[in-house]
Amino acid sequence: LKEMDEILLNTPNQKSIIDICKNNNLDPSQVVKVIIYLGRLEDKSKLPILVSIRGDQSINEVKLFNLINKKYKSNLISLEVIDKESDAIKNLNQVPFGFLGPDLEDNKINLDSKWEKRWIRVVDFSAYELSKFISGSNNLNFHKFFNSWSSLTQQFIKADVRRAKEGDYLSLETNETLIEKRGIEIGHIFQLGQKYSEKLRARFSDKKGNLGNIWMGCYGIGVTRLAQAAIEQNHDENGIIWPIE
């Protein structure tokens, strides 16, 4: 990305990575997108989280959940994306969705809200490695050219929160890459935490009589799918070859 004379770019109605790249001759890898999350802790705290990631990558919410969970003594119950359609938008002051930058001011959080009053700023390594990049200016219809991350005064948590994808190297010590293939889901685990029990007020009392929200999980095995998958991988022209296992 070449140095730009104009720091602000006029990008009317260019709210998506596709739009800004198409209209400004940019590649998604040169753009940093910013997403707002809200984390709810077991102690009722509500954490506004600002995640910056390279435009050609997507966020792995399990990684993000685990990252935030490790930084607080109280357990993280849920993590949700906040956009202009969210009910939680009432806790923000005129946030320009589609034009968010990593330096979004803390004063965008409504002082009357029950949220923490400072952003937890997370930047994925894919974005932090960029020496120059384009991102939102925090003003409607404008994006901004950033010279470096070091020019920003805010504190950032640098972490791996991106979703792995085909073509990624397995490690720095090998040229082997990930291959993506379609499969059949024969079982699943959903770690629901306290997301639903909090809303349903599904509680338990401990030995001391203290109330707590139930920790929930969903564990399933698709019996019919399991048979289907076994047949798909174990057959010949004469029919099914059931595996011994």
Predicted regions and their residues:
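Extended, low-hydrophobicity, polar/charged segments
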Residues: 1-226, 233, 237-242
